[in-house]
Amino acid sequence: MEKGDTHILVFPFPSQGHINPLLQLSKRLIAKGIKVSLVTTLHVSNHLQLQGAYSNSVKIEVISDGSEDRLETDTMRQTLDRFRQKMTKNLEDFLQKAMVSSNPPKFILYDSTMPWVLEVAKEFGLDRAPFYTQSCALNSINYHVLHGQLKLPPETPTISLPSMPLLRPSDLPAYDFDPASTDTIIDLLTSQYSNIQDANLLFCNTFDKLEGEIIQWMETLGRPVKTVGPTVPSAYLDKRVENDKHYGLSLFKPNEDVCLKWLDSKPSGSVLYVSYGSLVEMGEEQLKELALGIKETGKFFLWVVRDTEAEKLPPNFVESVAEKGLVVSWCSQLEVLAHPSVGCFFTHCGWNSTLEALCLGVPVVAFPQWADQVTNAKFLEDVWKVGKRVKRNEQRLASKEEVRSCIWEVMEGERASEFKSNSMEWKKWAKEAVDEGGSSDKNIEEFVAMLKQT
């Protein structure tokens, strides 16, 4: 790294869904002349696959996260406390050397779930900003929980928040998936807003057209808000960032060739793509209902079932659907969603998957499991109007009939053309946001100009 180059640190939370958005923003900053050092853990660095110019442009700085000291008996709070303590100390040690190097960093951009990074940055006189990997709608909900203006679970049948549609309790993020850790999870997610008054900027992985009113509300919190999303590889949007077709980090090995060859043989818009992310674990009864519902649609389908989940499928399921379905352990989701054969995405509604569906113009069947997925599903169905949300019964089970009905309605029903038309509109608006002169591109340009002036 040459002396005098404008240099920043990027510090993501060490999980795939948090690293990839910050990596994508880093690529756009590099394309505009900024030098980036990515601070991460050894485990993550071993899985990074930066291609072309980015393999040289992003300097990887590895620090310990304390995971080697973790005990199996540790609670989530104990694990997070150790992570914070270890990472704080190691970040301080790293910065003591970096700040006296020939080209010290001017700025640190960090994952919002690690607000303690801001305090370390202040110690060293570094300008700083949190990066929110989630939607601004979730930011609003968590902020109001932090300040005691909203309780989880809520005490009223409807919830009214500034610049948000009217919400029901079933639209709020579900943080009770691990009852023993609910309080810890809520503390972690609401702490993202505990010290924002000391941040220079707030970066959000969204775009103005998608969440404009909520973004305006965030700006009332007193710090400038920079929307820089969607953080999807440029090849699928504006194509202005060279050699940017993949995120650069995958903790799973995709069956890319198998999936794409199979899709090539199917008619346009005929395939249902099913994936519920890298973390969700589904109960055996629910997975069985899901499998039967998918099978009974008679649709071609590509289903990602991780190896750890495959044993929950009904006996001989894979063999029984061989003519219609392909079941794989992982795939390149962007490649699949961009394929013309795919007509619907059955998704858990993680924010990255939500953005990918919108960016690639694919209607959805929303099947959220926990956390922000629930709120994302609400917006996909009722605000952005690109699909249907699966309903559960009193036992919190989605029946095979409900699964089949939702898939059929999105792909063949009366509103199928509406869902597709709306999806294509969002695809256009997402591309416009990151293209030259778009809202997100302008925000990135302004940030780069600010860095070069200081």
From Swiss-Prot:
Alphabetically ordered keywords of this record: Disulfide bond, Glycosyltransferase, Transferase
List GO molecular-function terms, semicolon-separated.
Answer: quercetin 3-O-glucosyltransferase activity; quercetin 7-O-glucosyltransferase activity; UDP-glucosyltransferase activity
User: Which amino acid positions bind an anthocyanidin, per UniProt?
Assistant: H18, H144, A371
Q: Which residues cross the membrane?
A: none
Known consequence of changing D111A? Loss of catalytic activity
User: Which enzyme type, at the first EC level?
Assistant: transferase
What reactions does this protein catalyze?
A: mogrol + UDP-alpha-D-glucose = mogroside IE + UDP + H(+)
Pathway assignment: Secondary metabolite biosynthesis; terpenoid biosynthesis
The entry's UDP-alpha-D-glucose-binding residues are: S278, C331, Q333, W351, N352, S353, E356, D372, Q373
The disulfide bonds in this chain are C259-C331
- Its biological purpose: UDP-glycosyltransferase involved in the biosynthesis of cucurbitacin and mogroside tetracyclic triterpene natural products (e.g. siamenoside I and mogrosides IV, V and VI). Cucurbitacins have cytotoxic properties and exhibit deterrent taste as a defense barrier against herbivores. Mogrosides are nonsugar highly oxygenated compounds used as high-intensity zero-calorie sweeteners; they also possess pharmacological properties such as regulating immunity, lowering blood sugar and lipid levels, protecting the liver, and acting as antioxidants and antitumor agents.
- This chain's protein is named Mogroside I-E synthase
**Lineage, broadest ranks:** Eukaryota, Viridiplantae, Streptophyta, Embryophyta, Tracheophyta
